[in-house]
Amino acid sequence: MRQHVNPLSKNFFEIDPIPPLNQVFENPKLPLHLDIGCASGEFLFELSLKNKNWNYIGIEIREKLVLNANLKMKSRENKNLYFSFGNANNIFNQTNNKSIINLITSISFNFPDPWFKKKHHKRRVIQPKLLNLLSNSMKKGSLIFIKTDVRDLFDHMELTISESIKFKKIPYQDVDFCESFNPNRIQTNREKYVILNQLKIYESIYKKI
């Protein structure tokens, strides 16, 4: 069972800033993908090992998971992977995007916390403020991938992104997945669980315009 963490808590005002990319990646000029809500990071560990022509940053609000991921990094040869702890809004707001401005090629939100109660919808990760912050670090044509098994959350994410003038929904056939951050179509642990239990997956792709 996934443990929910309130992203609006004062505990997350202090964040782990993303340092200059030349300090964390062997080749900082590679295309950059962000996975927001990366959990334990296993998805990114596999991605980064199989796709050496991309750099990956995982952002996770649960500090223990980031600490464990960084411990694993010490025993693995992932020269194109970095983990950052904190609320994504605060990470991008406080760093002013200096380290990654106009460098993000794509972003994924995979099965984020649904926060079912209406009074908690403001805790859902995709909010107008975050989209504005992210757009400042995304190149024109950069992509946002959203995926969930919760229809209400999917509708919320779609509505929030569609209301932004900075993003446009595009059909799947317009995306060359062979050139994407995940050409092997690697699945997260949650996605494997959903498929195994024959549950429906809702997903969309948006382009920065």
Curated annotation (Swiss-Prot):
Pfam families hit by this protein: Methyltransf_4 (PF02390)
Function per UniProt: Catalyzes the formation of N(7)-methylguanine at position 46 (m7G46) in tRNA.
Catalytic center residues: 113
Catalyses which reaction(s): guanosine(46) in tRNA + S-adenosyl-L-methionine = N(7)-methylguanosine(46) in tRNA + S-adenosyl-L-homocysteine
Keywords: Methyltransferase, S-adenosyl-L-methionine, Transferase, tRNA processing
GO CC list: tRNA methyltransferase complex
Family named by the database record: Belongs to the class I-like SAM-binding methyltransferase superfamily. TrmB family.
Pathway: tRNA modification; N(7)-methylguanine-tRNA biosynthesis
Binding site for substrate: 117, 149
Top EC class for this record: transferase
Single Gene Ontology MF annotation: tRNA (guanine(46)-N7)-methyltransferase activity
InterPro entries, per the entry: SAM-dependent_MTases_sf (IPR029063), tRNA_(Gua-N-7)_MeTrfase_Trmb (IPR003358), tRNA_methyltr_TrmB_bact (IPR055361)
Annotated S-adenosyl-L-methionine binding sites: 35, 60, 87, 113
EC numbers on record: 2.1.1.33
Official protein name in the record: tRNA (guanine-N(7)-)-methyltransferase
Gene this chain is encoded by: trmB
Superkingdom of the organism of origin: Bacteria
